[in-house]
């Protein structure tokens, strides 16, 4: 099934004119994610190197170099904890498209998942390891992080749009977090508190395929700003059965 899934991913990418590349595994600077890297040493050049934690930076160089649609299916390494959902060595699928937006990429991801399910199982309904069935078919739900958090709290949470439109204050968000018993980081800002509060209400409760979109700018500073909403970026995460894919 794994080989069928990988073949299906490659076919769907090819159908959308994406070019597959292989980027370096050994890197002088680890980046593209917040994770602890494995380190090694290249004797030939007396050089300390890192096993990559993500291919993002090199894939984005491909975009800058003129490859408008690019993807990679390959191994990444993160020297962190191990559990049922995390491994120190794992296969990642990562893709980038120029002249698109988060709507076009969202539609692509939906097709990638549905095509893979069809090619492996012959249906959008897949059989999981515990024997239960899960349906990837039909329309997928989309929710806004700020709108859904406001609904859960019973009050409007406003994005931080800058000095002229500061939105809901860090102090007020902190008070809400303390009241709910939500853990807080040592370094706090509006965006981090919004995400922590949202995760408290929703993260493990989104069973059906759901795109969560419009994140705070503070937690995703390199993402394109929202076209109409100050303080928000055009980013989504996909949740399935309570897990972020």
Protein language model regions, located:
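Flexible helix-coil linker/hinge segments at domain or subdomain boundaries
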Residues: 116-126
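Extended, charge-rich, solvent-exposed interface segments
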Residues: 1-16, 21-30
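A translation/RNA-centric and nucleic-acid-associated enzymatic feature enriched
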Residues: 24-117, 134-135, 139-245
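Short linear capping/connector segments at secondary-structure termini
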Residues: 128-133
């Amino acid at each position: 099934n794994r080989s069928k899934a990988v073949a299906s991913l490659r076919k769907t990418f090819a159908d959308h004119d994406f070019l597959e590349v292989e980027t370096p595994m050994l890197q002088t600077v680890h980046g593209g994610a917040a994770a602890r890297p494995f380190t090694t040493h290249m004797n030939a050049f007396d050089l300390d190197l890192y096993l990559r934690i993500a291919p993002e930076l090199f894939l984005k160089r491909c975009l800058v170099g003129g490859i408008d649609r690019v993807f990679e299916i390959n191994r990444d390494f993160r020297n962190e904890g191990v559990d049922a959902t995390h491994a120190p060595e794992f296969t990642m699928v990562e893709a980038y498209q120029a002249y698109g937006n988060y709507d076009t990429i969202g539609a692509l991801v939906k097709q990638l998942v549905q095509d893979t399910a069809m090619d492996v199982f012959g249906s959008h309904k897949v059989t999981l390891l515990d024997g239960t069935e899960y349906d990837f078919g039909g329309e997928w739900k989309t929710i806004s992080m700020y709108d859904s958090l406001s609904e859960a709290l019973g009050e409007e949470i406003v994005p931080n749009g800058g000095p002229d439109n500061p939105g809901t204050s860090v102090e007020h968000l902190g008070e809400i977090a303390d009241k709910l018993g939500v853990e807080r980081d040592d370094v706090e800002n509006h965006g981090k508190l919004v995400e922590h509060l949202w995760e408290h209400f929703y993260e493990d409760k989104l069973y059906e395929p759901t795109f969560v979109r419009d994140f705070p700018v503070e937690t995703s500073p390199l993402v394109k700003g929202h076209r109409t909403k100050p303080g928000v970026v055009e980013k989504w995460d996909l949740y399935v059965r309570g897990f972020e894919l």
